[in-house]
């Protein structure tokens, strides 16, 4: 997670972790699902369709719960978004992720990315979440055992090793965020036109 951000976040009131968050719809972006499907298949070539379906369903639900939690959490903060940082994130999105989208859409996504990083930095300190070298090594070893693919590059290259740590930290923070709240599913709303 980004720790050297120019943007800032200030907690303006204590986060109410006993808040019940309403989930009124489940959003599943086909491109998001396909991206995860390909990632799973690249790691586990012999994955059965039922296991793949189960894992993708789990990912979609987790992503939706996390989004609902983050929507609630950002209301407890006041943000000061650095214009140069925002522009840099927007350019990266336009180049690597979103082609042809309107600037206001890209800006909204870029602001969410920056706010998420700021909130994660705050919550990581509050919850004292860390990923040790030993945990990173264990995950890399487990990956080797399951896939039989070479992992030496991740153990020998500090940048790749830290990339694994960052991915694990982000996943842990997503799960911690979800686990700090209660959710109520109210999926009886209207279908979008």
Swiss-Prot record:
GO BP annotation list: protein folding; protein transport
InterPro entries, per the entry: MPN555-like (IPR054820), Trigger_fac_C_sf (IPR037041), Trigger_fact/SurA_dom_sf (IPR027304)
Superkingdom of source: Bacteria
Disulphide bridges, residue numbers: none
Name recorded for this polypeptide: Uncharacterized protein MG377 homolog
Organism in which the protein naturally occurs: Mycoplasma pneumoniae (strain ATCC 29342 / M129 / Subtype 1) (Mycoplasmoides pneumoniae)
Organism placement in taxonomy: Bacteria, Bacillati, Mycoplasmatota, Mycoplasmoidales, Mycoplasmoidaceae
